[in-house]
A protein has these predicted regions:
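Catalytic-center loop of serine/cysteine hydrolases
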Residues: 1-76
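Flexible helix-coil transition and linker loops at the boundaries of alpha-helical arrays
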Residues: 41-45, 82-89, 122-131, 193-200
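Alpha-helical tetratricopeptide repeat
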Residues: 47-62, 92, 132, 136, ...
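Short coil/turn linking the two alpha-helices of tandem helical-hairpin repeats
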Residues: 58-67, 95, 100-107, 145-146, ...
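Alpha-helical protein-protein interaction modules
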Residues: 67, 110-111, 119-122, 136, ...
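Short, charge-rich amphipathic alpha-helical segments embedded
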Residues: 78-108, 234-235
Length: 296
């Protein structure tokens, strides 16, 4: 094992630009030191560029702050694949962009995201069965296709390959929620958050559902209030939680915000979307939505 250290002078005024500068510096330093002999013999300028593009793309997709992140990351991964169609890092990263758009509720056509994510993750695993990210993405796509055993198997494999894989741990939390084990899901989300203390909102959405399904409605509300820009999916859980707490005023406010975004929504839409193995396990959430004033 090696410990690398470096000093870096910068003005803390434009963090995105600074991040790009540090990324380029790290890429060139690592290539120059760790892979010096290989580069001398074989690495071309285009390969160095592809490596930098991959690191930048993964930085964006893991950040998951807004739809532009996954869009730019996808373009960078596709650029890498045009020069190296067998890049498993780019393939699994591309799969993650589609999964992120699905989980973050950013895609206009969410139904297309899961097949796309599964396609690229499967291709990555064909080339490299030890790709932890591909296993994690593939596992979560299996969940929304209602293949629960396969979902957990791939997520377990991802964690076996990388015990610190926060997305895989959160993915396990989702599987446990939808297979009726919310208490165990809370443990997995706790692990995920310990590895990623600045999580994408889908971690918090899943954690809130686990709290809700264990009758911890205050915890569900507090979790969702950590999300900077809640969307209709987050607000539905908020509305149901407030309603279960007897705060009908707040529940109605969240309901109205949801209906302003999707005027034709009914609680049956949630029944269809959420992949519960046992349909009875969603009924507590449905009851909360009805208490909040949503239509059946």
């Amino acid at each position: 094992n090696y410990l690398w250290s470096e000093t870096f002078d910068a003005v803390m005024t434009d963090l995105p630009v600074l991040q790009d500068e540090i990324t380029r510096h790290i890429v060139m330093t690592l290539i120059g030191n760790i892979e010096q002999n290989a580069i001398r013999d074989s690495v071309t300028k285009s390969e160095v560029t592809a490596y930098a593009d991959t690191i930048r793309a993964r930085q964006l997709v893991y950040r998951m702050r807004d739809p532009a992140d996954t869009k730019t990351a996808r373009e960078l991964f596709q650029k890498v694949l045009r020069t190296d169609s067998a890049s498993t890092t780019a393939l699994s990263g591309l799969a993650l962009t589609y999964l992120a758009d699905f989980l973050m509720m950013w895609a206009e056509d969410r139904n297309a995201c899961i097949p796309q994510a599964a396609h690229y993750a499967s291709h990555a695993l064909e080339l490299d069965p030890a790709d932890s990210l591909a296993h994690a993405v593939f596992g979560i796509t299996y969940l929304w296709r209602r293949h629960y055993i396969e979902a957990m198997a791939h997520l377990d494999q991802a964690i076996s390959l990388n015990p610190n894989h926060a997305d895989a741990l959160a993915g396990r939390g989702l599987v446990l929620i939808f297979t009726g084990e919310p208490e165990s899901a809370l443990v997995e989300f706790g692990k995920a958050l310990s590895h990623n203390p600045f999580p994408p909102s889908w971690y918090l959405w899943g954690l809130a559902i686990a709290h809700y399904n264990t009758d911890r409605y205050v915890d569900a509300v507090q979790t969702l209030l950590r999300i900077d820009n809640p969307n209709r999916f987050h607000r539905r859980v908020l509305a149901a939680s407030y309603a279960q707490l007897g705060d009908i005023g707040q529940a109605a406010a969240e309901r109205d915000a949801v209906m302003a975004e999707v005027p034709n929504y009914t609680v049956n839409d949630s029944r269809r979307f959420q992949p519960y193995q046992d349909p009875q396990n969603i009924e507590s959430f449905i009851n909360g939505l009805l208490l909040a004033g949503f239509l059946d």
